Design a protein with these regions (language model features):
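Membrane-embedded alpha-helical bundles of polytopic integral membrane proteins
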Residues: 1-164
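Hydrophobic transmembrane alpha-helices of multi-pass small-molecule transporters
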Residues: 3, 116-117, 198, 205, ...
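Juxtamembrane helix-boundary/capping and inter-helix hinge elements in multi-pass membrane proteins
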Residues: 92-97, 178-187
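Divalent-cation-assisted or electrostatically stabilized phosphate/pyrophosphate-binding catalytic cores
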Residues: 110, 187-203
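Juxtamembrane boundary at the C-terminal end of a transmembrane helix
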Residues: 126, 210-216
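C-terminal transmembrane helix pair
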Residues: 177, 202-208
Length: 216
């Protein structure tokens, strides 16, 4: 259900409404961070910088880049999160960040880094065969320009870099919360914490993905 809402918001709203809602969510995330009166350190400073950077990118997303690129960046982070969580629960044995995020395992970490690239490139290949359902789903993803400009190897590498940025964003948020001795940044989303808890893995991934695409 949440995925459908995101699709409707990203692709079926006008630029003004899209910009207002996106900026409002980011500003509320900024409020969630600042209201905790967190001392500015490396981790909170990085979060602050990337929240502000994402706010600054709202106009380029609507006027220069495309909603498809924005959605693709979101998808990279989501696939990274889901694959890391599921593979970590199923096969995870070795804890790699005990003082930052004690539930993060090496197996989940590796899955979160590589699975988004494998998933997106696999379905970009399948989409060539005019399979109706795949084509309908894949119309929201913009990866062909990267494949044409960079080739498969560099595109795969670029997607892996974006996945790493997603994981780093999540780890930075986890470290910030541990320093503050809190579980979540907020409680505006029942069962999910605050907006910042949902956005942490996207904050670095989105700018990096857009920067990579600016070279096309």
């Amino acid at each position: 259900f949440l995925g459908i809402l995101v699709l409707l918001f990203v692709f079926y709203t006008n630029n003004l409404f899209f910009s207002i809602i996106l900026v409002s969510i980011l500003l509320f995330s900024l409020y969630e961070l600042l209201r905790l009166k967190v001392k500015l350190n490396l981790f909170s400073g990085i979060m602050l910088f990337f929240i502000l950077l994402n706010i600054a990118l709202v106009y380029p997303i609507t006027e220069i880049f495309s909603r498809n690129l924005f959605f693709t960046a979101l998808l990279i982070s989501v696939i990274s999160d889901v694959s890391a969580l599921s593979m970590g629960k199923l096969f995870g044995k070795k804890i790699i960040f005990p003082h930052i995020s004690p539930n993060k395992t090496l197996e989940g970490f590796i899955s979160g880094i590589f699975f988004p690239a494998i998933f997106i490139l696999f379905f970009s290949y399948i989409a060539q065969f005019d399979l109706t359902i795949i084509n309908i789903l894949f119309q929201f993803i913009e990866i062909k320009p990267m494949l044409i400009s960079f080739g498969h190897v560099l595109t795969f590498s670029a997607l892996v870099v974006c996945s790493i940025m997603s994981v780093i964003g999540d780890l930075i948020a986890s470290k910030t919360k541990r320093l503050l001795e809190i579980k979540d940044f907020g409680d505006v989303l029942p069962g999910h914490g605050g907006f910042l808890d949902r956005l942490d893995s996207h904050l670095i991934c989105i700018p990096v993905f857009l920067i990579i695409n600016s070279f096309i």
